[in-house]
Amino acid sequence: MRPQAAHRATLTALTALAPVSWGTTYAVTTEFLPPDRPLFTGLLRALPAGLLLLALARVLPRGAWWWKSVVLGALNIGAFFPLLFLSAYRLPGGMAAVVGSVGPLFVVGLSALLLGQRPSPRTLLTGVAAAFGVSLVVLQAAGALDVLGVLAAFASTASMSAGIVLTKRWGRPEGVGPLALTGWQLTAGGLLIAPLAVLVEGAPPALDGRAVGGYLYLALANTAVAYWLWFRGIGRLTATQATFLGPLSPLTAAVVGWAALGQTLTPVQLAGMALAFGATVAGQIGPRRKPSGSEAVRGTSGGPVLGSPGRKAPRDPMDVTGQGVTGPALRR
């Protein structure tokens, strides 16, 4: 293998560790953490990681980016994390993760509304196919799945999708890297979760060694390190390569649920998962023409899109999912 190809393969493998890590969130939540504490869990995942990234980046927001960071932090972290963990507490990991594959449809609709980007027929078809695959999974398991958990999973996906589209609309400040912008959002989101966690869930629960280990894993490996690897890769890989890695998160969740937790999936549900993942990947890795210089996306401050300085914006709004919507998207 040539040195350049070997370097690219190594970079891709390291970047892929981020969505793989995010796919373990559901199993860690249900097996290691105190039950029914979605706000507390979201707080301990977001705030320590955000403060760590702020210490590493040593850059604070300026001007309008104070309130923009709060808005993005609320959508990408403050609302997303609690809803994500609520769904993780109430749904099997594979089920909760696959709901996130409807995210491209949310992104398409919000991109048309906020960015004026008209989706192509291929984008709409693949988005509908992904949603149909999700419906096969959810409807086939209607008797076993918790309604509140399903609603929380959809709401978390919608929240992250809105955050991704606004991130694309605003770009990032001149001279600020993705690590700093991620730190701003994690810190803002964690600070927003903190008072809600106290008001709704009361005092923090007593933690045993198992829970402490779970929280350390979520804050450090699953969030701080995973986000660093993700945005480092986003800046060096093409958009197609980055978005192709996204389905690794729900796939990991489903595999971990089956292999380690004894969860089962019916043949129809497996077909739905395959359809959803396949449609999402097909919509993101299809051939795209290179955009002209006039199509470069910059925010109001003139900065490029998060995670890829100077990157040109594709006309297909599906491409913005390459910003890390699974992950963190979290599921990510």
Feature locations, PLM:
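Specific alpha-helical transmembrane segments that line the substrate/conduction pathway
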Residues: 40-51, 76, 81-118, 122-127, ...
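Specific transmembrane alpha-helical segments of multi-pass solute transporters/efflux pumps
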Residues: 21-29, 54-100, 108-110, 136, ...
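Juxtamembrane helix-entry segments on the extracytoplasmic side of multipass membrane proteins
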Residues: 7-11, 34-39, 43, 62-67, ...
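Cytoplasmic-side transmembrane-helix entry/capping segments in multi-pass membrane proteins
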Residues: 65-74, 119-130, 149-153, 175-185, ...
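Helix-helix packing/entry segments at the starts of transmembrane helices
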Residues: 42-44, 96-104, 166-190, 220-259
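Hydrophobic transmembrane alpha-helices of multi-pass small-molecule transport proteins
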Residues: 53, 110, 119-139, 157-160, ...
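Glycine-/small-residue-enriched transmembrane alpha-helix faces in small-molecule transporters
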Residues: 1-43, 132, 142-169, 191-192, ...
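Hydrophobic/aromatic residues within transmembrane alpha-helices
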Residues: 32, 41, 45, 87, ...
